[in-house]
Regions:
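N-terminal Rossmann-like NAD(P)+-binding domain of SDR-like oxidoreductases, especially those catalyzing
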Residues: 1-137
Length: 137
């Protein structure tokens, strides 16, 4: 069996990715590593939550030792975890930095230590900035 490890797998994008890989790769076990905060819910995975092929780990990306431990022997690592909603970042700056910056560093360090060969990093539409009226003229 292949091991697919998805951070943020209970969030909106992450849960859709989890279901996609679950259905597409029947010979795999999916590990979802998610802090499960305001923007995530195990209910997003209710269609597959009873399967023995799905393991949900409620942990934070800032916990490097747990991340390294649980991601051992991973064949494909998908990093979809992030604090989202730009407005929240103004009031929760430290939380955003811990998750989005330190958390991503921890993901990359754990993948390096565990010799993960395939990594997919999901980002946000916010990296593109605003679209101006003349952008598509």
């Amino acid at each position: 069996m292949h091991k697919i490890f998805i951070t943020g797998g209970c969030g909106f994008i992450g849960s859709h990715l989890t279901e996609y890989f679950f259905e597409r790769y029947k010979n795999s076990i999916i590990y979802v590593y998610d802090k499960i905060t305001y923007a995530a819910s195990v209910k997003n995975l209710e269609n597959i939550s009873n399967s023995k092929r799905l393991k949900i780990i409620k942990k934070d990306l800032s916990d490097y030792s747990a991340l390294e431990k649980y991601s051992k022997n991973t064949d494909l690592f998908i990093h979809a975890a992030a604090e989202s909603h730009v407005d929240n970042s103004f009031n929760l700056t430290n939380e955003f930095i811990l998750t989005n910056v330190l958390g991503t560093k921890n993901v990359l360090d754990a993948c390096k230590v565990n010799k993960v060969k395939k990594i997919i990093h999901i980002s946000t539409d916010e990296i593109y900035g605003e679209i101006y009226k003349s952008s598509f003229d």
